[in-house]
């Protein structure tokens, strides 16, 4: 990739000439994102994000372009990088760069470039720092926290345990050699973060439990209108899109093994069954396993499924769910992919020693010593974004409406004391607001409670209608 970097411009993209194409697709996406566009229209005059300088680390797609332009329309200053080396849509990045927003992203970044670009979102052109983070997976948040700790204890970045850590640690060392307090200065300036996905939320809760988190965070992922829609319905459409674009495989009749039966796994299993695959599920949680069984899926272990499955999809957010030994047992031409945030759900490092033959970008044959080949998609990273274009605009509207509301909330309350350091979720009435805005596009008609009915079930007529502990 010969990325375009103009020293007179504050961006790095694949081809700025793609901006026109990107702008046309952004215009189409806006018509499919009613919730986000309604938030833009509602708050534009008030400029609730005026003064906010947002460092964004989230997949640089067409839908994200609509989010970025919403944040700017509400008064924010924004710099952006993708949170995945394969997920950028180059025409989207070009359109945003051409509009004057600094963006550092192209499809197929190296890990070195990835961490370089993540650093760039914190380097404001005027020499200042950001004061907010919008994160997906937690890498931007991790970078500042780890870097600040490494300023005091270099041993923290002395012994990487993975390829990802090798490049992360090297990037931190390089930055510290130039500016020994860069991380702590940036960290001190951040007033809050809003986190998009399950993996990043896990990181935030772990940091909070250890006393390491240095600013308040809103867990956007666990808003109902995010997790029960983006994670489930988004994956239900984008998983198979990625597999089909990559392989053109016939799914009907195949044994498809879905590792993990959370919201992402549920959507993935539904998609594969809709195309008449025989869907097997692996699970550690007896409740999720029981749900899968009651839906008619066969619940098995990966040890058992490895030699039988034709298509494998990891959806757990966990580590080495598919191991070297599992892949060694697989059928010739088995398809292996991941739709969880990071690439370590599949032990890709363990098979790097074998012969890899690139069929096309993000589609590789891996040849084992016995001559068998398996097909690995997107090198174990997100298949729906590596091999396709991710979730549809409509479902991302819910997620990004929540992101925007969360940014407004944290920024508005930055000095009020409402959010001491910790991890929070948006209140129920805002969740319901996003759902109402989304329903407009579907011509849905909501039934209204009478005063008597509202009193009978103990809620306000206008909502919220469910207790915080309610499980949708």
Swiss-Prot record:
Cytoplasm in keyword set: yes
Biological pathway: Amino-acid biosynthesis; L-homocysteine biosynthesis; L-homocysteine from S-adenosyl-L-homocysteine: step 1/1
Keyword Hydrolase belongs to the record: yes
InterPro entries in alphabetical order: Adenosylhomocyst_ase-like_sf (IPR042172), Adenosylhomocysteinase-like (IPR000043), Ado_hCys_hydrolase_NAD-bd (IPR015878), NAD(P)-bd_dom_sf (IPR036291), S-Ado-L-homoCys_hydrolase_CS (IPR020082)
Enzyme Commission number(s) of this protein: 3.13.2.1
The organism's place on the tree of life at top rank: Bacteria
GO molecular function: adenosylhomocysteinase activity
SUPFAM superfamilies xref list: Formate/glycerate dehydrogenase catalytic domain-like, NAD(P)-binding Rossmann-fold domains
Binding positions (NAD(+)): 197-199, 231, 260-265, 283, 318, 339-341, 384
Entry's localization field: Cytoplasm
Major localization listed first in the record, in broad terms: cytoplasm
Residues the record lists as binding substrate: 61, 136, 196, 226, 230
Entries under SMART domains matching the protein: AdoHcyase, AdoHcyase_NAD
Entry-linked Pfam families: AdoHcyase (PF05221), AdoHcyase_NAD (PF00670)
EC class name: hydrolase
Note on cofactor: Binds 1 NAD(+) per subunit.
A cellular component annotation (GO) from this entry: cytosol
Family statement: Belongs to the adenosylhomocysteinase family.
Annotated protein name in UniProt: Adenosylhomocysteinase
Biological source species: Cupriavidus metallidurans (strain ATCC 43123 / DSM 2839 / NBRC 102507 / CH34) (Ralstonia metallidurans)
């Amino acid at each position: 990739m010969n990325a375009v970097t103009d020293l007179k411009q504050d961006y790095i993209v694949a081809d700025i000439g793609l901006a026109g194409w990107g702008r046309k697709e952004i215009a189409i996406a806006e018509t499919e994102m009613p919730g986000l566009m309604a938030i833009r229209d509602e708050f534009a005059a008030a400029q609730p994000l005026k003064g906010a300088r947002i460092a964004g680390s989230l997949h640089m797609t067409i839908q994200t372009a609509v989010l970025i332009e919403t944040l700017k329309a509400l008064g924010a200053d924004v710099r952006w990088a993708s949170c995945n080396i394969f997920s950028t849509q180059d025409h989207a990045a070009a359109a945003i760069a051409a509009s004057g927003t600094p963006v550092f992203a192209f499809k197929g970044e190296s890990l070195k470039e990835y961490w370089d670009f993540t650093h760039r979102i914190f380097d404001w052109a005027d020499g200042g720092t950001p004061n907010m983070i919008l994160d997906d997976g937690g890498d931007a948040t991790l970078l500042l926290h780890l870097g600040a700790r490494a300023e005091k204890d270099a041993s923290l970045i002395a012994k990487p345990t993975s390829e990802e850590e090798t490049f992360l640690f090297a990037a931190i060392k390089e930055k510290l050699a130039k500016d020994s307090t860069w991380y702590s200065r940036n960290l001190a300036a951040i007033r809050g973060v809003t986190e998009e996905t399950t993996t990043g939320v896990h990181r935030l809760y772990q940091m909070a439990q250890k006393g390491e988190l240095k600013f308040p965070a809103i867990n956007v992922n666990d808003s109902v209108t995010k997790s029960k829609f983006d994670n489930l319905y988004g994956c239900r459409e984008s998983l198979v899109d990625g597999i089909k674009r990559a392989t053109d495989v016939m799914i009907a009749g195949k044994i498809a093994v879905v590792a993990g039966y959370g919201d992402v796994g549920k959507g993935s299993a539904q998609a594969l069954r809709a195309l008449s695959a025989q869907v097997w599920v692996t699970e550690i949680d007896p409740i999720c396993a029981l749900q899968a069984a009651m839906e008619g899926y066969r619940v098995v272990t990966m040890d058992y499924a490895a030699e039988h499955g034709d298509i494998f999809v990891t959806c757990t957010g966990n580590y080495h769910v598919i191991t070297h030994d599992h892949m060694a047992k697989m059928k010739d031409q088995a398809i292996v992919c991941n739709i969880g945030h990071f690439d370590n759900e599949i032990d890709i490092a363990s098979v790097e020693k074998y012969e890899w033959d690139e069929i096309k970008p993000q589609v590789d044959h891996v040849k084992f010593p016995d001559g068998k080949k398996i097909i690995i998609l997107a090198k174990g990273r997100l298949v729906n974004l590596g091999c396709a274009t991710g979730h549809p605009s409509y479902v991302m509207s819910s997620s990004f409406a929540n992101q925007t509301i969360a940014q407004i909330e944290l920024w508005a309350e930055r000095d009020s004391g409402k959010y001491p350091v910790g991890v929070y979720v948006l209140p129920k009435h805002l969740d319901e607001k996003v759902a109402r805005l989304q329903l407009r596009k579907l011509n849905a008609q909501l039934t209204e409670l009478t005063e008597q009915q509202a009193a009978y079930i103990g809620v306000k007529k206008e909502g919220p209608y469910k207790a915080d502990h309610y499980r949708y």
